[in-house]
């Protein structure tokens, strides 16, 4: 069975040897004084290094005291929910969107209201209507403005400005999940919403090193105002006390000596080639052209393919009969179906992508609905 990812990196190209060497050095260096209980916010060395990293590369303006390390971005979302949301609070989220985030918010017994997404990103007019209707119960909005999940669209400049005005007027937190920031293929990436200095106290910036290095290394971070960080730290102490200090110190070394940045450049070039190969495959096969529509993304690790003439559930069934696993569009909506699916290209070689397209082509032929024998 071949599983088409929804947008994960290729773990086969992870910088394993540099990381292993850095971990050995970190373990030796920490043996005498650094292997006891530490700060729940994470290793101070990595927090300082990350602050410099995002300030330089992403236009933020933060210090180590405004950084909290987490176990991946999912850990960051859960930590935010438990620290900042009360039972009965409401948080707005993109729709279609990232369902694991919705579940994290509901873990804190908060209510999630869904805001539609179109070609310019979050429908800020709909968000504003929710804010007025809820009269103070709406506390935050969760967005993926750089590469919206799952549709891959980038939030337009006009929508970004409107979002800032809404959050300022209604005193909402912007929970910005900036996943896949490093993977931009067309020009310079947009700066995060959190780079806006006049809104920094209301911005909660979430990012992850897991997709940059390897998904199995659960290492994410939150950047927020110090008052928010204090609440995050208190809850983190109750959840799992602290992270993996040896891993955190090793990653700090890899960022400081430029290994992470070099790996990102190599990966970005490779993933761009894979994206282009997949787009060529989709464009050159008539059955795929007829059934699939796509707006080529300027970054990220997946395509959002809209279906014509077949439901995503039916395509998933046909693909499964041919030993191919796809995730239906319904995984990204609150209820019902969605005639689309994410095709993650980064984790597959060009040969593997061609083979997957062979299977998809077979699934979309007129007689493909018949049971395979």
Where does each model-flagged region fall?
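Conserved core of the PLP fold type I
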Residues: 23, 28-170, 175, 182-200, ...
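Short hydrophobic/aromatic beta-strand micro-patches
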Residues: 223, 304-306, 344-346
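Helix N-cap motif at beta-to-alpha junctions
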Residues: 308-312, 349-350
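PLP-dependent enzyme catalytic core of the Aspartate aminotransferase-like
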Residues: 321, 335-373
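Conserved core segment of the aminotransferase class I/II
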Residues: 19, 199, 204-269
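Conserved glycine-rich beta-strand-loop-beta hairpin in the small C-terminal domain of fold type I
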Residues: 252, 268-279, 291-306, 315
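A short, glycine/Asx- and small/polar-enriched loop/turn
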Residues: 74-75, 189, 299, 335-340
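N-terminal "arm"/small-domain region of PLP-dependent enzymes with the aminotransferase-like
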Residues: 1-41, 52, 321-325
